[in-house]
């Protein structure tokens, strides 16, 4: 959507990109105190199922962060998929992965989950995360572990 493309432009500073003339929901940015609060919010916003979206992704900076969120979701009894460097398939539903393993994939909804730390790769990670979203993008920051 134009809203997601404009958000991605802001991350890179690149201007004058030709945008698709398809409007959608504004990008949502929020801060959370911990991962549990982030996961609660994701399940309020996720729209998966019949007459809704087919795919959603939680995208993180590192494999350790992705695997932690995946384990937390499994412990809650949620149906969730995990993509790591050994994965060979991408399934419908909710997927957890990293920004670099999400390259080349697209999801109806994307939930970017990033830590409140300075990292030279973080802007690039957020850009890749943003460009994976087809319809809705949520960028969440965890301020404490």
Where are these regions (language model features)?
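Core RecA-like ATPase module of SF1/SF2 helicases and allied nucleic-acid translocases
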Residues: 1-5, 15, 47-145
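Conserved coupling/interface region of RecA-like P-loop/ASCE motor cores
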Residues: 1-34
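Conserved interdomain hinge at the start of the Helicase C-terminal
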Residues: 29-54
């Amino acid at each position: 959507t134009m809203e997601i493309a404009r958000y991605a432009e802001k991350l890179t500073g690149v201007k004058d990109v030709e945008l698709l003339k398809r409007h959608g929901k504004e990008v949502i940015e929020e801060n959370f105190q911990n991962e549990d609060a982030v996961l609660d919010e994701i399940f309020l916003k996720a729209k998966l199922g019949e007459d809704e979206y087919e795919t959603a992704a939680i995208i993180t900076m590192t494999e350790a962060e992705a695997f932690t969120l995946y384990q937390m979701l499994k412990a809650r009894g949620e149906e969730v998929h995990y993509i790591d460097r050994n994965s060979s398939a991408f399934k419908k539903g909710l997927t957890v992965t990293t920004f670099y393993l999400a390259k080349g994939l697209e999801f109806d909804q994307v939930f970017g989950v990033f830590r409140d730390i300075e990292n030279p790769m973080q802007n690039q990670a957020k850009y890749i995360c943003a460009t994976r979203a087809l319809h809705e993008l949520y960028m969440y920051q965890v301020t404490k572990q």
